[in-house]
């Protein structure tokens, strides 16, 4: 099968090469179609995404991307925003779990964030009323709420999760977040075997840094989902351990959500774990569950052993050496 690979900026090319090597070692049979995108490509070409990229994604329905930067200034929109809008990837999935061997405050985090990906304040509807007043529109619709809540409960049912928690601020945003919460409760009634509750966003942030193990699946509107995704990544060591999947009806785009780290680009210092875990998510959705499980197990075992790991988790290994160590475990 074919899939699009977008290395992106900075360390992207190095960690994308890790994916290619692991994919070959697992005998996935994936034919990678590589396209350039990001600030570096824009500096060379004046375009943020290489011609043919979007058509290739549409044709095959699968893509994996590294970190991409958006040039500062007018004329460029975020690549992630463009991809979400073009392919209507309405759900952003962020599994977060503790990795033995990565020093953190908690050793029992295992939760999943389901973020609505298409509306809310991120719809980008904002304007100046005059020179001193700016206004932004928080757009929430019942169809989008129902779709993301149903996705969260279906995910919980399929993956043996026991509880889904709605994240909101309906005590203040009574119409917009109120609509989200009402829709969540309506959908929850169709899944009686799954516990459904809700938590106000500010209280949730406090509880996450006190006792994160009390949560299982969190479903949230766009803005809150963005905030808690990074917060939860911090609970397990940072964005270097946080894979992501953007899911639409006919297209799925997987990514490492950390930065492009231009200060270490080209130096064989990058940690490829996030993009390898994103690749494991992709394999799982492709039905290659055994290969996905093998890859995740190899990563966890390598990190837990702690001998051949990258500098950000206390080791001295480079990107290539770490990748080869993971492959050896496969």
Q: Where are each of the predicted segments found?
A:
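Short glycine-rich or small-residue beta-strand-to-loop segments that form or flank ligand, phosphate
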Residues: 2-8, 63-67, 164-170, 278-284
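N-terminal beta-loop-helix "entrance" segment that forms/cooperates
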Residues: 30-52, 206-208
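Short, glycine-/small-residue-rich phosphate/pyrophosphate-handling segment
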Residues: 99-125, 139-143, 259-292
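Glycine-rich phosphate/diphosphate-binding loop of Rossmann-like nucleotide-binding domains
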Residues: 4-26, 130-202, 214
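N-terminal glycine-rich phosphate/adenylate-binding segment common to multiple enzyme folds
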Residues: 43-135, 223
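Glycine-rich phosphate/nucleotide-binding loop
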Residues: 39-42, 207-307
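Buried hydrophobic positions in well-ordered alpha/beta secondary-structure cores of metabolic enzymes
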Residues: 9-12, 61, 114, 152, ...
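Flexible, glycine/charged-enriched surface loops at secondary-structure junctions
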Residues: 31-33, 159-168, 191-199, 288-294, ...
């Amino acid at each position: 099968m074919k899939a699009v690979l977008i290395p992106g900026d900075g360390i992207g090319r190095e960690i994308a090469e890790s994916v290619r090597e692991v994919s070959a070692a697992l005998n996935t049979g994936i034919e990678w179609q590589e396209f350039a995108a990001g600030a570096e490509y824009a500096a060379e070409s004046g375009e943020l995404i290489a011609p043919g990229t979007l058509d290739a994604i549409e044709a095959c329905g699968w893509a994996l991307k590294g970190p991409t930067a958006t040039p500062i200034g007018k004329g460029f929109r975020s690549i992630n925003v463009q991809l979400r809008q073009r392919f209507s990837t309405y759900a952003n999935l962020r599994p977060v779990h503790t990795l033995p061997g990565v020093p953190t405050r908690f050793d029992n985090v295992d939760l999943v964030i389901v973020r609505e990906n298409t509306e809310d304040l991120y719809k980008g509807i904002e304007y100046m009323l005059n020179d001193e007043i700016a206004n932004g529109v928080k757009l929430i619709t019942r169809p989008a709420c129902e779709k993301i809540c149903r996705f969260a409960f279906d995910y919980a049912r399929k993956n043996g999760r026991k509880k889904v928690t709605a994240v909101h601020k309906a005590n203040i945003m009574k119409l917009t977040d109120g609509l989200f919460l009402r829709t969540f409760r309506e959908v929850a009634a169709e899944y009686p075997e799954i516990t459904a509750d809700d938590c106000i966003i500010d209280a949730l942030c406090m509880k996450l840094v006190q006792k994160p193990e009390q949560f299982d699946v969190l479903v949230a509107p766009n803005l809150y989902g963005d905030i808690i995704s990074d917060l939860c990544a911090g609970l397990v060591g940072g964005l270097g351990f946080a894979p992501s999947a953007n899911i639409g009806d006919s297209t799925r785009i997987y990514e490492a959500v950390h930065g492009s780290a231009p200060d270490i680009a080209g130096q064989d210092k990058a940690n490829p774990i996030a993009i390898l875990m994103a690749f494991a998510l992709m394999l799982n959705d492709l039905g290659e569950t055994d290969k996905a499980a093998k890859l995740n197990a190899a990563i966890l075992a390598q990190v837990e052993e702690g001998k051949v790991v990258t500098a950000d988790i206390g080791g001295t290994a480079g990107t290539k050496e770490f990748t080869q160590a993971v492959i050896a475990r496969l």
